[in-house]
Design a protein with these regions (language model features):
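Glycine/tryptophan-enriched, flexible segments
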Residues: 80-83, 101-253
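Trp/Phe/Arg-rich N-terminal binding region typifying the photolyase-homology
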Residues: 1-119
Length: 255
């Protein structure tokens, strides 16, 4: 969180989302367990304490710092004999040698059923650390009075209002600063922080398309194109991580 591409308002959004998640998990029998520290040290302590032999996590494409951290975690797990199982969260594929067939793979993933949340979670013998405030981890205050609030329920409400009313002028209004804030979905942070899944947004869009309402075919098609673009451009970063530091085209490297 001290990287130059992070901010206090992003952390506040995450904090609100985590509080809401903690409440939902507690209602199912097991609150969220938070640990603060370096990833390898925290995971090593948890695995030793609870005799963990397998870790489940999701794939992400972020920046050079997180990539280095992830490699450290994978190397530690390999040396410790701990199995790592990674789950794909977007339509981004690891270690692709060709983009041929990418769109078909995207559609295949997004059309799989969404898994329901469990009704009950078994309790674990673990005490949670306190969720750190911004000043605890060296993040400068970054007030933004009209920013979006982090919370799955808030994201679902935005998605509902987009498909019911706000999104009807989406295609025409998205490029207009005066109208875009109301007519666009505003789902980006909820997708980025996992409050809503890409598959969930895609399948809701497909369901709305099937309603066949007059005047909605074009905006829904445009919205679905943006969902594809989301993963298309992240795939570029996955395939070319050096793009964070170098121009995409090698002809510009010496400039």
């Amino acid at each position: 969180w001290q990287q130059p591409d992070m901010s206090g308002r992003q952390y506040d959004f995450l904090s609100e989302s985590v509080v809401a998640l903690d409440q939902e998990l507690a209602a199912r029998g097991q609150p969220l367990v938070v640990r603060v520290g370096e990833a390898v040290a925290v995971l090593a302590a948890l695995c030793a304490r609870h005799k963990v032999r397998r870790i489940h996590l999701h794939q992400e494409t972020w920046n050079g710092w997180t990539y280095a951290r992830d490699r450290q975690v994978l190397a530690w797990a390999r040396d410790a004999g701990i199995e790592i199982i990674e789950y794909q969260q977007f339509g981004v594929h690891r270690r692709m040698t060709s983009r041929r067939g990418w769109a078909g793979k995207w559609d295949q993933m997004m059309n799989r059923p969404c898994l329901p949340a469990p009704d009950h979670l078994p309790a674990v013998d673990a005490v949670s650390d306190a969720w750190p405030a911004t000043q605890d981890i060296g993040i400068a205050n970054d007030p933004c009075p009209h920013r979006q609030q982090g919370d799955r329920a808030a994201g679902l409400a935005l998605m509902h209002s987009f498909f019911e009313t706000r999104g009807r002028d989406y295609r025409a209004a998205m490029a207009t600063p005066v109208r875009a804030a109301d007519s666009c979905s505003r789902l980006s942070p909820y997708l980025a922080f996992g409050c809503i899944s890409m598959r969930e947004a895609w399948q809701e869009s497909q369901a709305q398309r099937a309603r066949g309402r007059h005047g909605w075919a074009s905006p829904i098609k445009s919205f679905e194109s943006r969902l594809h673009w989301h993963c298309h451009f992240i795939q570029k970063l996955e395939d070319e991580p050096a793009a964070e530091f170098l121009p995409f085209h090698p002809a510009y490297h010496a400039l």
